[in-house]
Amino acid sequence: MTNYKELFSWTLLEEIGNAYTHGIRIKTPVTVALPPKKLETTLDLDDSIIKFYNQTSRLELAWELTDTPENTEPFQKNQFIIENYLKKDYSWSFVKELLSGYINITASDVVFDKEYNESQTFTYTLNKLNITDHFFAFDIQSSVTACFKKTDNHVPDIIWLIHTDADQVYDMKIGLEEYLNLAYQSKCFKNWQLVYLFGKKAAEYELMKQFIPLIFKHIETDLSAFDINTNKKH
């Protein structure tokens, strides 16, 4: 298994920091990568889940554009942003949040804790949809949560996505490793999960297509899994 603790807390963090080499400043208000702790659960977990939590007990990384006039000017004057957001009365702070990245992997001591999961927003979505299956939050975002799902006493390595505004729960048809690889490839771009599932139908598709290669143009980005070609120079 890839060392995901190192991939996010070292490799991605370095890539974020080096955006300054082409004039883009990014800040990382949250960076957490804790040593591993034993998973406290009687559930039968797939080996890949155990192997991941043997690397780290908690992983969190947030990045956003540094909000200074000289740093944000190229984005605020971008024609796509002007036409699709600013002219439609969306604030710059709203747009800036869309142009950010976040991964928030649940800590090992609560990932399979019943009370913890019942207190999360995704539970209200399940109740609204009258879904009684047991889900466990793996990556908690503001509007989407990537989860594992229990079958009897077994938790297979299959990622499900719960969107606060959706009318169903989505089987992403990927496991933990592919999920984390996709998160890295997208630089944890906000709602990358929706782009992966729905492609061009997702509102975030065009944002990812235009701005990940721009923000990270100091490195080779691979967004092919999202049906985005980044081979051309930016």
What are these regions (language model features)?
Residues 10, 46, 173-177, 189, ...:
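Alpha-helix initiation and N-capping motif
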Residues 182, 193-234:
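Charge-dense, low-complexity intrinsically disordered regions
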Residues 132-134, 155, 175:
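A generic structural signal for well-ordered coil/turn residues at beta-strand boundaries
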Residues 142-144, 152-157:
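Coil-to-beta-strand transition motifs
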Residues 158-191:
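Compact, glycine/acidic-enriched structural inserts
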Residues 1-143:
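A surface-exposed partner-binding patch
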Residues 35, 39, 165-170, 194, ...:
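Short, charged/polar micro-motifs that form catalytic or ligand-binding hotspots
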